[in-house]
């Protein structure tokens, strides 16, 4: 199934062009093409093994495509330093990845310090304020002194502290309880709009994809089955697989479509 075309007038922040990747004999990505305009939130959803995390990790070179091109901004990632590329893109994982023996403020200031920002610690304090964890109250704590939701807020603060234009999120809220997850989703939507961030989110939860993504991409067996706004996917599923996913998630989708 081919992709729905994006707005050609919008500058592209991220682009995958006919990307393939194998893990041994397993085809993880099979000719995937995807354009994400600046400022858009795109959510990739699919079952385990669909290729969604592999595709996301191509954009910060944690995975190198076998063939095809990955473009960040207007440059092929292969001509960019992996270290500098990763420092220029925010990245949030499911379990946060915080350094356990560093206090919260130092964790958040890590990338600004590495990038040589003169106001690194001020930037970290501002990022903590944006996620609702003021540095005066939380900056001196260690990660183990925080709740799961608070740790993910710190991880989100760290991802935006160096003021990136792009953030990649790999199942960022998947390990949280339902209340913490809902609160953090709401905070993230407001934060993304305030900072005009381009975001690429991977999730197994179709309702979460609909809440957080302007566009939703459904992947299966290394290919894109369908792309579009959640309402369009629900109204006109392109394949039986997409229709089955929607039916399983219908109860969670109803509030989004009311």
Locate the predicted segments by residue.
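ABC-type ATPase nucleotide-binding domains, specifically the catalytic core motifs of the NBD
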Residues: 80-82, 102, 106-121, 129-132
């Amino acid at each position: 199934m081919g992709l729905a075309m994006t707005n050609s007038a919008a500058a592209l922040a991220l682009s995958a062009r006919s990307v393939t990747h194998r893990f041994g004999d397993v085809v993880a990505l099979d000719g995937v093409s995807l354009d994400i305009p600046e400022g858009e939130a795109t959510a990739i959803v699919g079952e385990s093994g669909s290729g969604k995390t592999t595709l996301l990790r191509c954009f910060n070179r944690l995975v190198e495509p076998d063939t095809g091109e990955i473009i960040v901004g207007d440059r092929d990632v292969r001509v960019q330093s992996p270290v500098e590329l990763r420092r220029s893109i925010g990245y949030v994982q499911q379990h946060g990845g915080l350094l356990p023996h560093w206090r919260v403020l130092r964790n958040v200031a890590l990338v600004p310090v590495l990038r040589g920002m003169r106001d690194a610690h001020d930037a970290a304090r501002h990022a903590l304020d944006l996620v609702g964890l003021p540095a005066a109250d939380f900056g001196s704590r260690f990660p183990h002194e925080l709740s799961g939701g608070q740790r993910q807020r710190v991880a989100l603060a760290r991802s935006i502290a160096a003021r990136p234009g792009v953030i990649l999120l790999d199942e960022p809220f998947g390990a949280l309880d339902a209340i913490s997850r809902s609160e953090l989703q709401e905070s993230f939507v407001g934060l993304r709009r305030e900072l005009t961030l381009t975001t690429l989110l991977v999730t197994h939860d179709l309702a979460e994809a609909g809440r957080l993504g302007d566009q939703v991409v459904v992947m299966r067996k290394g290919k894109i089955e369908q792309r579009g706004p959640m309402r369009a996917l629900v109204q006109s599923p392109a394949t039986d697989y997409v229709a089955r996913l929607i039916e399983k998630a219908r109860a969670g989708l109803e509030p989004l479509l009311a």
